[in-house]
């Protein structure tokens, strides 16, 4: 079989272009894994009624996030060694198979195992999907395409709970997972038939020790952050043991990576300024999103008295602003550069999250929606330039690791954010319940788990619980605003001009990613290089 070469031109961008089927398949698979991170939230009551295991249901969320996060760096390295196609196809196949297992689950432990397998498949899709886009489109083309992909991720993540409620109310909670089968199969077939790449075959020394240390260490770190303060106290022996072991394993990992011939996560991704600042921004972005999506709907319902649908619409304003801004981000960063475009976006995100933090007990839903819309505009403007910036400074043989590291940082940020915001909310609630006003002693719940019951009592107890929940949510919203400021600082620290990074082991045959006109940092219209993806599968010869 001879492999054809497609010259990349701006005219061939879009779903109807030659590379359109590949773009559509990547967008579809990305939407599925993003939906599955949140879609089960509103179906939990139906799942528990059917399978039991109420005390175990939090693992449906934790285990998916955990296995997805820890596999991302490994997949990134494998994609740089063996190519994107086999890794991405493997990930989609595992995700679809695991979805079938989840749909047929006979018990809560079985469903948890299925969710773990889903996360293993999702890790490949999350990292390699973005990498494929970086391979088959130039920077100018990615101005539009990455906006599509960022919008798909953001919108799918936030709409997940709404779709989960529809499935569980009108069909069955099992269809939350079974619907992935035909859609995932379409993505799998399209990628197999239409996506090809040329990978230089040579002998590799896989960094097995590094992969094991990174996976186990990060698993324990995320586990400790997610379960600390809920499954066990932060100061308990279990919590200390888990976190100390995680730190020890990750320290050993850095030692191994310094000596590895082909490290699974090269330490230069933490030393190069453009990559370090991009990863810090991604980490903070992951925390910001989990804070808003987790606490804003609950606050709107319990404090403002909104219905579940109204609260969902308020949060959906973020998903409305995100794609609108993302569709224009590319045009903007081609004119003023990655850094400046992202900086404008994060300033808007700071304004939006600050507006949310300023909302009081008697805020109107339109005010909530307005602040979310501004935040969505800001995130839409900043997310695409950040990922394109880090991809554009390395060649094909390093783009998988760079992209995976950025996605990994966002996943770690989600776990850290969930832990920190949860600690803020729980500490505030516990403090207020421990010292109620005169006349309410004995009526106010003694622990945080009694918040829902207190809200349903009515009278002074319910009002105090409402005020307490507002205080807890207010603390979280302030923390999200601070997180947005962290993103702004990271973006401001990015280099003003994006240039190709140089490495000692590069040769003249490496990918030519010379800086292009203006701040974009790459020339449009070049043909794919050796070890690159054409974005289509040529006919058999």
Describe the function of each predicted region:
Residues 2-193, 329-330, 336, 344-350, ...:
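Transmembrane-helix bundle of Major Facilitator Superfamily
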Residues 130, 190, 216-224:
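Specific aromatic-rich, kink-prone transmembrane helix
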Residues 8, 387, 393, 405, ...:
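Hydrophobic transmembrane architecture of multi-pass small-molecule transporters
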Residues 12-16, 140, 186-215, 230-231, ...:
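Flexible interhelical linker loops that connect adjacent transmembrane helices
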């Amino acid at each position: 079989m001879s492999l054809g070469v497609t010259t990349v031109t701006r005219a061939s961008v879009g779903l109807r272009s030659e590379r359109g089927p590949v773009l559509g398949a990547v967008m579809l698979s990305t939407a599925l894994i993003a939906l599955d991170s949140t879609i089960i939230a509103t179906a939990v009551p139906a799942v528990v009624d059917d399978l039991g295991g109420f005390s175990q249901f939090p693992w449906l969320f934790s285990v998916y996030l955990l296995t997805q996060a820890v596999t991302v760096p490994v997949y990134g390295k494998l994609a740089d060694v063996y190519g994107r196609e086999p890794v991405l196809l493997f990930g989609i196949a595992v995700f679809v198979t695991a979805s079938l297992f989840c749909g047929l689950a006979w018990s809560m432990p079985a469903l948890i195992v299925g969710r773990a397998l889903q996360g293993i498949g999702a890790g490949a899709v999350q990292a390699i999907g973005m990498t494929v886009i970086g391979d088959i489109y130039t920077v100018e083309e990615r101005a539009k395409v990455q906006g599509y992909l960022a919008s798909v991720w953001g919108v799918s993540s936030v709409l997940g709970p709404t779709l989960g409620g529809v499935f569980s109310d009108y069909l069955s909670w099992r269809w939350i997972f079974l619907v992935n089968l035909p859609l995932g199969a379409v993505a799998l077939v399209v990628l197999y038939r239409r996506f090809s790449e040329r990978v230089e075959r040579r002998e590799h020394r896989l960094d097995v020790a590094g992969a094991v240390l990174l996976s186990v260490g990060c698993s324990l770190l995320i586990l400790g952050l997610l379960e600390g303060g809920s499954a066990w106290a932060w100061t308990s022996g279990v919590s200390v043991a888990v976190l100390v072991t995680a730190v020890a394993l990750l320290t050993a990992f850095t030692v191994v990576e310094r000596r590895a011939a082909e490290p699974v996560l090269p330490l230069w991704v933490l030393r190069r300024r453009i990559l370090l600042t991009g990863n810090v921004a991604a980490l903070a972005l992951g925390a910001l999103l989990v804070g808003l999506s987790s606490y804003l709907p609950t606050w709107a319902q319990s404090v403002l008295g909104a219905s579940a649908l109204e609260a969902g619409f308020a949060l959906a304003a973020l998903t409305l602003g995100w794609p609108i801004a993302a569709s224009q981000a590319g045009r903007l960063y081609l004119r003023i550069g990655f850094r400046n475009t992202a900086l404008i976006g994060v300033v808007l995100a700071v304004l939006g999250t600050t507006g949310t933090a300023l909302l009081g007990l008697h805020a109107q839903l339109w005010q909530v929606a307005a602040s979310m819309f501004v935040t969505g505009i800001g995130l839409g403007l900043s997310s695409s330039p950040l990922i394109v910036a880090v991809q554009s400074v390395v060649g094909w043989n390093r783009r998988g690791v760079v992209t995976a590291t950025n996605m990994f940082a966002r996943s770690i940020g989600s776990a850290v954010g969930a832990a920190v915001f949860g600690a803020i909310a729980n500490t505030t609630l516990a403090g207020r319940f421990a010292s109620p006003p005169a006349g309410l002693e004995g009526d106010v719940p003694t622990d945080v788990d009694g918040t829902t019951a207190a809200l349903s009592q009515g009278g002074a107890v319910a009002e105090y619980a409402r005020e307490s929940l507002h205080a807890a949510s207010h603390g979280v919203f302030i923390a999200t605003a601070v997180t947005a400021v962290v993103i702004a600082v990271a973006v401001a620290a990015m280099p003003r001009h994006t240039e190709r990074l140089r490495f000692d082991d590069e040769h003249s045959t490496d990918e030519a990613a010379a800086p292009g006109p203006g701040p974009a940092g790459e020339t449009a219209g070049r043909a794919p290089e050796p070890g690159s993806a054409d974005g289509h599968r040529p006919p058999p010869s």
